Amino acid sequence: MTMSDPIADMLTRIRNALMAGHTSVRAPSSKIKVAIAKILKEEGFVEDYYVTRERPQPQLVVRLKYVGERKERHPVITGLKRVSKPGCRVYTRVSQIPWVRSGVGIAILTTPKGVLTGQQARRLGVGGEVLCQVW
């Protein structure tokens, strides 16, 4: 059976792993998922990511980031929200790119210039499809 929304599946796997206190999470790999993981690493939300060369489907492994000591540690990511869904796509102009939690979080967009954060898209003057929000 095929998956109807692979990006939402990846975000849900990350959310569930954070709630369970896991150090890493695995998901089937794709170019857009790797681009999202790259942005999460650049913005400091995850420690690292890499792609395994398993057959038949390569796996994206994301190492999650926590703050604090062992018993008092809290995840850096406090929330993930899928915005544009297969049944209801959400596109935005550069002037209407959303601010997430008053600038604390990020919006991730897919644009003609690639997968970008909301801030990068504003700087480049491009709009696009709002994939998700992370805070």
Can you name each region flagged by the protein language model?
Residues 1-135:
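Core subunits and conserved enzymes of cellular information-processing
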